């Protein structure tokens, strides 16, 4: 109950856009604050909410009882990218969790995206299934932008580990599948300037990437749907933070489409979180990874996978693929797994 109240109250204030209406310096009385909100709320009720959240560090009051920012809530004014992530989580990260039980009743496997927690949250009243995560975002440009901005922040914090995650010196040509606007490719090619990299993604993302003025000459961009056959022949194919967004059946489709292009000696490289065995590693690390696993389930009906699960998924797609190694760069939440085609 304690954490539910903490999370639910802060979520409510974020969705009411209260932090946006509080001045960064100074304060604002409750009567004036409620007049700025798009959603009507009684000043006394708003006061009750804020007088609770101030005790956990979100918003505060001055000596006269007017509302002012705390360091945590000031992020909504000072840091738009992080604020966008918080708003996205208020809409999509928390609410689907209350549909987990209902989702299990409809889909005990946890694999049906249209009966997953988020789909049930977004469904029409009385329906037994709903839209997928990506379909929801397609109709919600505000949260779509928050999602992409959040992914950019997340990627910026993790990209630095990519250059040291694999011996890129042995690779001459690389296909970065689902590589967005080429941020990861740029890190690799700046550290290993001999590599020729093809970045593949959806048409609208590739169009945006091509408009950037800082493209490296060794990076080319190509429109590609990874559920269709891979058109490029290369030394290595790279899936970074892709498979954890998809259930096992869809991951099998993705890997098999790459398999059609593999030649002897080519490598499949997958960089994703790898779930530990229970009790393996630190409690903090395991908690973070398993929280991510449940997050993938609630949003996508997907999962984080253990090494055994990842190997089984890949090697069942193509018997020519022999597992080589797993390497986790120091400080990274994701590991690099490599297979060679024999």
From Swiss-Prot:
Enzyme Commission number: 2.1.1.293
Gene3D superfamilies hit by this protein: Vaccinia Virus protein VP39, Winged helix-like DNA-binding domain superfamily/Winged helix DNA-binding domain
Pfam family, one: Methyltransf_2
Enzyme class: transferase
GO biological process: methylation; verruculogen biosynthetic process
Top-level taxon of the source organism: Eukaryota
Site residues (Required for binding 6-hydroxytryprostatin B), renumbered to this chain: 202
Catalytic residue positions: 244 (proton acceptor)
InterPro entries: COMT-like, O_MeTrfase_dom, SAM-dependent_MTases_sf, WH-like_DNA-bd_sf, WH_DNA-bd_sf
UniProt similarity note: Belongs to the class I-like SAM-binding methyltransferase superfamily. Cation-independent O-methyltransferase family.
Stated role: 6-hydroxytryprostatin B O-methyltransferase; part of the gene cluster that mediates the biosynthesis of fumitremorgins, indole alkaloids that carry not only intriguing chemical structures, but also interesting biological and pharmacological activities. The biosynthesis of fumitremorgin-type alkaloids begins by condensation of the two amino acids L-tryptophan and L-proline to brevianamide F, catalyzed by the non-ribosomal peptide synthetase ftmA.
Protein name from the UniProt record: 6-hydroxytryprostatin B O-methyltransferase
